[in-house]
Amino acid sequence: MQKLINSVQNYAWGSKTALTELYGMENPSSQPMAELWMGAHPKSSSRVQNAAGDIVSLRDVIESDKSTLLGEAVAKRFGELPFLFKVLCAAQPLSIQVHPNKHNSEIGFAKENAAGIPMDAAERNYKDPNHKPELVFALTPFLAMNAFREFSEIVSLLQPVAGAHPAIAHFLQQPHAERLSELFANLLNMQGEEKSRALAILKSALDSQQGEPWQTIRLISEFYPEDSGLFSPLLLNVVKLNPGEAMFLFAETPHAYLQGVALEVMANSDNVLRAGLTPKYIDIPELVANVKFEAKPANQLLTQPVKQGAELDFPIPVDDFAFSLHDLSDKETTISQQSAAILFCVEGDATLWKGSQQLQLKPGESAFIAANESPVTVKGHGRLARVYNKL
């Protein structure tokens, strides 16, 4: 059991105050503190103190004894800690993204390698051969977009902007997946006069439309006034997660985080195809080839947890990670898994022990539990979040 020393990513969209207000993390230079990373990602691994008292990378520690620390099954299947755990603090909208599935990631990665596209090139889509399933768990009210709305809903929302682009009128005549695909690509492809005219029609519709999703379009327009992604809340479900609610983000499904603080768990991948709300490169043909143009009703988007005593388990449809919450009390309970785990203190305080070793966690602090240290005993007040594998 080792307490983690974690790094903060200072992306421009991050909140300057959330990590300080929630977890007392200092921000003397008033930087945006977008993400706190917990894990062993090569870009920014957590660190731990070793037996000699030196501060070392968790990635290096795991590398030295994978089977013991990760567990036999995870070491064999993934060869590394297969997940990255984050606290994400969005003060402004992130780009609309789509993550390719595993098969397409393998093909795309090999193709771009063969073409000799450098890893850091703006037009590089595939940074690795992995998929990137994600779970987001709200710590504060959290605004997001996820998956296409039901087509009847899209039709009704597009009526006030029917004249903005011929592809909108075309979709309204026959609302089906193929025409939605054309509409999606056409809106992203808009340039110059065509784009200015479409956005002017959308903005004039805002004057007469109230409630959602128009309110979300207004919010986004404060940050991206000239981005064709402003049409996306008319096509995608706008989701407001209350604290304690969670949502899984499937491959090939457009989504965006807009505002709020959440825990996010993801597979170890950087494969992102952007689809708006970004100054970065958008590869429209590759994007459209990796999107499933199918509707997902908003009432099916939340992940329903399963309660087992003091544990809330959030079922995940992939093996890359599992996520659960533990309500703590003065009564000792055990936490066990066949894999490594990262425990994060969401609120209150936690005391963990294994044999003679004891560890205290305060809000915002986290610990790495090796597979061979399971089970650990825990008690306290408040809540722990646990990320691990069910292999």
Curated annotation (Swiss-Prot):
Superkingdom: Bacteria
Family: Belongs to the mannose-6-phosphate isomerase type 1 family.
GO MF entry, a single one: mannose-6-phosphate isomerase activity
Species this chain originates from: Shigella flexneri
Cofactor remark from the record: Binds 1 zinc ion per subunit.
InterPro entries the UniProt entry points to: Man6P_Isoase-1 (IPR001250), Mannose-6-P_Isomerase (IPR016305), MPI_cupin_dom (IPR049071), Pmannose_isomerase-type1_CS (IPR018050), PMI_typeI_cat (IPR046457), PMI_typeI_hel (IPR046458), RmlC-like_jellyroll (IPR014710), RmlC_Cupin_sf (IPR011051)
Function: Involved in the conversion of glucose to GDP-L-fucose, which can be converted to L-fucose, a capsular polysaccharide.
The keyword Metal-binding belongs to this UniProt entry's keyword annotation: yes
Catalytic site positions: 274
TM spans (from-to): none
UniProt name for this protein: Mannose-6-phosphate isomerase
The EC number(s) this enzyme carries: 5.3.1.8
Localization per record: Cytoplasm
Reactions mediated catalytically: D-mannose 6-phosphate = D-fructose 6-phosphate
SUPFAM superfamilies (alphabetical): RmlC-like cupins
Keyword annotations from UniProtKB, A to Z: Acetylation, Cytoplasm, Isomerase, Metal-binding, Zinc
Cytoplasm found in the keyword field: yes
Cofactor(s), by name: Zn(2+)
Matches recorded under PANTHER family: MANNOSE-6-PHOSPHATE ISOMERASE
Binding positions for Zn(2+) per the UniProt entry: 97, 99, 134, 255
Modified residues (N6-acetyllysine): 280
Enzyme class: isomerase
GO biological process: carbohydrate metabolic process; GDP-mannose biosynthetic process
NCBIfam families linked to this entry: manA, PRK15131.1
GO cellular component, one term: cytosol
Family annotation (PROSITE patterns): PMI_I_1 (PS00965), PMI_I_2 (PS00966)
